[in-house]
Swiss-Prot record:
The keyword Phosphoprotein applies. Forms a heterohexameric complex with NEC1. It is a single-pass membrane protein. Phosphorylated. Keywords: Host membrane, Host nucleus, Late protein, Membrane, Phosphoprotein, Transmembrane, Transmembrane helix. The gene is NEC2. This is Nuclear egress protein 2. Belongs to the herpesviridae NEC2 protein family. Signal peptide: none annotated. Plays an essential role in virion nuclear egress, the first step of virion release from infected cell. Within the host nucleus, NEC1 interacts with the newly formed capsid through the vertexes and directs it to the inner nuclear membrane by associating with NEC2. Induces the budding of the capsid at the inner nuclear membrane as well as its envelopment into the perinuclear space. Coiled coil: none annotated.
């Protein structure tokens, strides 16, 4: 896959799924180039300026990125960093753990309540979501289809805080039914037109063939939609 197109698609995932439909987020996309794909690269693919009072679907977007990078045989796992530099609280999305993590200040662990004072950060990688959910859900419910980590922002003048939550669908049977229907479709071979990209990206994506290779992407997309329809409940 063309590197520029990959950067566009990863940024589209953030734009489409980080918040609920209709919520506009401030995303700054980096200029693509070989430097962003090197191990330990210090430039984020995109930076999101976080806003007060919103819920961010952080685990869903992370897992979507991880799948996308795996599908193009990228050898490293993504790394997301939430930080407060005193001027703004941002989410930076990297293709791998940057070598200059100290630049983001004192690192705090993901927890139910995180007070993100000036020059502190939360670094999220592959295992952090499972570790956070371990004490909150049964082991059979740790995957993203049965539970997801989200965070809510409290960003006011004298308080910069994040509340990490685990949400589950109210009707797991309905979720399983929808996912089963999609899985059955995977055995068929037809052309599927993906949703149009946002006008800001101005990227024209050609129709692609539905197969077992890309069924995971479709299922993840449906999970996001199902989460909205079924109104995920907090644990």
């Amino acid at each position: 896959m063309n590197s520029t197109r990959l950067v566009y698609e990863l940024c589209d995932i953030v734009n489409l799924y980080l918040c609920q439909p209709g919520v506009q987020i401030d995303v700054d996309r980096c200029a693509s180039g070989p430097h962003v794909f090197t191990k330990g690269g210090t430039e984020a693919i995109c930076t999101v300026k976080l806003s007060h009072g919103l819920v961010y679907n952080i685990e869903f977007v992370y897992k979507f990125w991880a799948h996308k990078l795996e599908s193009v045989k990228y050898p490293f796992s993504p790394c997301f960093i939430i930080s407060n530099n005193g001027l703004a609280t941002t989410l930076k999305c990297f293709l791998s753990r940057p070598r200059n993590v100290n630049h983001f200040g004192h690192v705090l662990n993901i927890d139910s309540d995180v007070y993100l004072t000036k020059n502190t950060s939360v670094i999220l990688s592959q295992d952090d979501f499972v570790k956070f959910k371990t004490n909150l859900v049964f082991s059979k419910d740790l995957d993203v289809f049965h539970s997801m980590v989200v965070f809510r922002t409290y960003l006011i003048e004298h308080r910069q805080a994040l509340q990490f939550l685990v949400v589950k669908p109210r009707s797991s049977k309905r979720v399983n039914s929808i996912l089963s229907s999609v899985a059955k479709t995977a055995s068929q071979n037809f052309i599927l037109d993906p949703p149009r990209r946002s006008e800001e990206t101005r990227v024209c994506i050609k129709p692609w063939t539905l197969s077992k290779k890309n069924i995971w992407t479709i299922i993840l997309s449906l999970v996001a939609v199902v989460a909205i329809i079924l109104k995920w409940r907090e644990l």
